[in-house]
Regions:
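Carbohydrate-interacting regions of secretory-pathway proteins
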Residues: 7-359
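Bacterial N-terminal signal peptides
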Residues: 1-4
C-alpha cells in the first residue's frame, strides 16, 4: 500500500518544496505532518479536503498518521473549529473556537504537557476505532468542519548511531570480496566521508522498528548512495534501502531519477525530489512494521506499506526482523558526507494496523 496524493500543479526545478519548514526547523529534525497541499501520509477514510493551505475534515471524519512516532516527541499545530485530538495515555484535547489557535504538545514517556489557548482536556471520552498504538488521532465532532494547518512534529531523545569521531560501532562489510573498493574516513570537521565503491559500512546496532535521522551532502552531481536497514546479518546490502539520489527528469522534481532521495529503492519512489546536490539535507525514516515513511528536509516523500507475504529475505517479501544498518558506497564516482546519524527504537507495537473506522 502506498499512500500518495498528486500535487495540484507541476512544480519547476527551482522550487524545492511548495510549502515546507524553514531550513533551521528542518535541520532541527522537525517533520511536516501536513504538507499544505494534500493529506499525504494520513489514514483518513472520512470526507476531507485541502483548500488554500488548510486541511478541512467534515463532521464525523477521523484521521490517523500513517506511522507511530515513539514515546518522546513535540507536536505543534494550528487548529480552528471543533476538533478533538487523541493523544497517548488517554489524553483527549478539544477545541471549539472558530479562529485558529496554536497548540504545542510535548510527550515525554508517560507524561503529556500541552499549551494552547482555546483547548480543554476531556475525560471519559471513548477513543474512536483506529490503530491502537497511534501517536495521535484527530476527529471532527461537527457540525462545522475541523480545520488544521502548520502541523509538524519533532522526534526527541534519539541516540547517536555514529559517534562523529571514529568508526567504532561500524565495520566494513567483507561479505562480498568483489565489492571492497570503498573508502570510509572521518574528516577534520567530524563528518563521515564515503568515497569510491562498491562497498558497504555496517552498524553493530540492529533494529526492526525505529526512527532514523541523518544529514547528508553529495560532493558531485547525481551521485548515488543509500542507507540500508533491517539487513540480513552477514550478507552484502540485503535489506530495505532508503535511497540517496537528487536527480530528476524533465525539469520536474516530481519525476525522480532512480527512485529519488527518500525513496524506498525498488519499492516506492519519492513523490518529490526535495534535496539538492552539493548542499546538506536531512533524511528521516520511520520503519513501523510493514509501514515505511520518509521525509527529506522535513517534507514527507514516501508513505508505503509492504504488501508482500512475510519472508526472511527482504528482496523476496516483507521482512520484519531486526537487522543492521549499512551505508552504501555505490560506485567509483561516489563521494558523499554524512553527519548526525541518530536513531531511536520504537516501542513494541500491535501485530497489525487495523483500518480506521468512522466513530
Amino acid at each position: 500500500m502506498t499512500v500518495s496524493a498528486p500535487f495540484p500543479s507541476k512544480a519547476s526545478a527551482d522550487t524545492a518544496v511548495p510549502q515546507g519548514l524553514t531550513p533551521a526547523q528542518a535541520a532541527e529534525g522537525w517533520l511536516l505532518l501536513f504538507d499544505g497541499q494534500t493529506a499525504f501520509s494520513w489514514d483518513c477514510p472520512g470526507k476531507n479536503a485541502v483548500r488554500e493551505g488548510v486541511w478541512h475534515l467534515e463532521e464525523g471524519s477521523t484521521a490517523w498518521p500513517f506511522s507511530r512516532f515513539g514515546n518522546h516527541w513535540e507536536l505543534v499545530a494550528e487548529v480552528a473549529g471543533p476538533v478533538r485530538l487523541y493523544l497517548p495515555h488517554e489524553h483527549v484535547l478539544e477545541h471549539n473556537g472558530d479562529s485558529f489557535d496554536r497548540l504545542q504538545v510535548v510527550c515525554n514517556g508517560k507524561k503529556i504537557r500541552y499549551e494552547g489557548k482555546g483547548f480543554s482536556r476531556l475525560s471519559s471520552v471513548e477513543r474512536p476505532a483506529g490503530p491502537p498504538a497511534a501517536t495521535i488521532g484527530i476527529t471532527a465532532p461537527g457540525p462545522q468542519p475541523a480545520r488544521l494547518r502548520h502541523l509538524r512534529l519533532r522526534p526527541q531523545q534519539l541516540q547517536p548511531l555514529w559517534n562523529g569521531r571514529n568508526l567504532d560501532g561500524w565495520t566494513v562489510n567483507r561479505a562480498d570480496p568483489k565489492r571492497q573498493q570503498a573508502r570510509f574516513r572521518i574528516t577534520d570537521q567530524g563528518e563521515l566521508l564515503v568515497e569510491g565503491g562498491p562497498g558497504d559500512l555496517v552498524s553493530t546496532v540492529h533494529a526492526a522498528d525505529f526512527i532514523l535521522q541523518f544529514d547528508c551532502r553529495t560532493l558531485g552531481k547525481h551521485l548515488n548512495s543509500g542507507v540500508f536497514f533491517r539487513c540480513i546479518p552477514g550478507q552484502y546490502q540485503n535489506g530495505y534501502e532508503v535511497q540517496i539520489h537528487n536527480g530528476y527528469k524533465n525539469n520536474d522534481r516530481t519525476q525522480p531519477l532512480d527512485f529519488g532521495t527518500g525513496g524506498i529503492y525498488r519499492r516506492a519512489p519519492a513523490r518529490r525530489v526535495v534535496s539538492n546536490d552539493e548542499e546538506w539535507f536531512t533524511v528521516s525514516l520511520i520503519a513501523d512494521g510493514r509501514r515505511l515513511v520518509t521525509w527529506v528536509n522535513g517534507f514527507p516523500v514516501v508513505a508505503w506499506e509492504d504488501p508482500r507475504p512475510p519472508h526472511d529475505n527482504p528482496r523476496q517479501g516483507y521482512r520484519a526482523a531486526a537487522g543492521p544498518f549499512s551505508i552504501q558506497a555505490h560506485d567509483p564516482t561516489t563521494r558523499l558526507l554524512f553527519r548526525r546519524i541518530q536513531y531511536a527504537p520504537l516501542p513494541p507495537r500491535p501485530n497489525s494496523h487495523p483500518t480506521p473506522q468512522l466513530p
